[in-house]
């Protein structure tokens, strides 16, 4: 919202630039679709537009997604990134608060599974400034949600991290450490869980990179995890409307200490292969659904 009483003549373009409420701008889906349709086929083939203009706390959200597909067949591959719990954002959204237990979210994920849409979901694993030694507040609810939708391809954005939602670290002492695994152990447990085989993780955002390369030990832990499960991770920059390629490469280069420790096969899968596999499959599934359902 551009609230003149809050920011005056300054027009905010990012959620941190204003204290005014945020709202879901549904026209974004039509705007993206029209822009995509103006591209040449060779350009379209390089893009996977995503539906984002829905309120995940609204029981009509799944209907909105269906209408977008019916109105613009041949365009969209998935939904997201959309947000449930996010530091500095959730409290600013006008209307009902989104929740991992809201049936509106279940309707969204159920419909995505029916169509074959890939889902990118941002949900902080914990509250900001959480105390060490405690289980992340939203971890159990998140896993329960993921298990309720085994037919839906879901990507947990940023592995649940944020600007101040940092990786879980156990307190000193074996007893506490045993009760509270660190972030890498949480991810590994989820990766080994057969009920979560449909879930992948993206390592996009420079805020995630700062945790990944924060120390030699952190670099070693994450690179070992990526080498062991390269089919479950996707790299991305998470840049918002970058002006040039250098802006994109700045985030990519932050990961150089990690890239240096990956096997060639794992490196390619994390940087490109996992994305191609998930999104190419989703694109084919969505097009098939549109042929069968859009009249």
Features from the language model and the residues they span:
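Mid-to-C-terminal alpha-helical segments outside catalytic/metal-binding sites
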Residues: 1, 208, 224-234, 239-295
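Active-site gating/metal-coordination segments in enzymes
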Residues: 2-135
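Catalytic pocket-lining loop regions of alpha/beta-barrel enzymes
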Residues: 40, 94-235
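Structural helix-adjacent loops and short alpha-helical linkers that scaffold large soluble proteins
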Residues: 44, 151, 195, 260-269
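Solvent-exposed loop/turn segments at secondary-structure junctions
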Residues: 54-58, 84-87, 125-128, 160-163, ...
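Short aromatic-enriched loop/helix-cap "lid" or pocket-rim segments at secondary-structure transitions
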Residues: 62, 91-93, 132-133, 166-170, ...
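Structured loop/turn residues at beta-strand edges in well-structured enzyme cores
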Residues: 74-77, 194, 231, 265
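Divalent metal-coordination and catalytic microenvironments
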Residues: 79, 112, 158, 201, ...
């Amino acid at each position: 919202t551009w609230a003149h009483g809050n920011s005056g003549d300054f027009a905010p373009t990012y959620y941190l630039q204003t204290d005014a409420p945020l709202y879901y701008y549904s026209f974004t889906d039509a705007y993206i679709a029209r822009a995509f349709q103006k591209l040449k086929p060779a350009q379209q083939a390089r893009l996977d537009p995503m539906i984002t203009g829905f309120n995940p706390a609204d029981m009509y959200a799944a209907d909105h997604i269906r209408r977008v597909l019916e109105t613009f067949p041949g365009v969209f591959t998935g939904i997201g990134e959309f947000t449930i719990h996010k530091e500095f954002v959730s409290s600013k959204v006008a209307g009902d608060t989104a929740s991992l237990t809201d049936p509106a979210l279940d309707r969204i994920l159920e419909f995505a599974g029916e169509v074959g849409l890939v889902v990118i979901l941002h949900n902080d694993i914990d509250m900001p400034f959480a105390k060490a030694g405690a289980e992340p507040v939203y971890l159990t609810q998140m896993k329960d949600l993921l298990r309720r939708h085994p037919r839906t391809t879901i990507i947990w954005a940023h592995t649940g991290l944020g600007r101040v939602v940092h990786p879980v670290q156990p307190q000193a002492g074996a007893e506490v450490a045993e009760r509270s695994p660190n972030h890498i152990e949480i991810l590994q447990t989820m990766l080994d869980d057969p009920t979560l085989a449909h879930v992948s993780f993206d390592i996009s955002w420079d805020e995630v990179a700062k945790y990944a390369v924060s120390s030699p030990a952190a670099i070693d832990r994450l690179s070992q995890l990526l080498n062991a499960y390269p089919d479950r991770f996707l790299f991305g920059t998470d840049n918002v409307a970058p002006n040039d390629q250098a802006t994109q490469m700045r985030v990519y280069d932050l990961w150089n200490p990690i890239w240096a420790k990956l096997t060639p096969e794992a490196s390619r899968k994390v940087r490109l292969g996992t994305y191609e596999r998930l999104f190419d499959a989703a694109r084919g599934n969505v097009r098939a659904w549109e042929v069968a359902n859009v009249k």
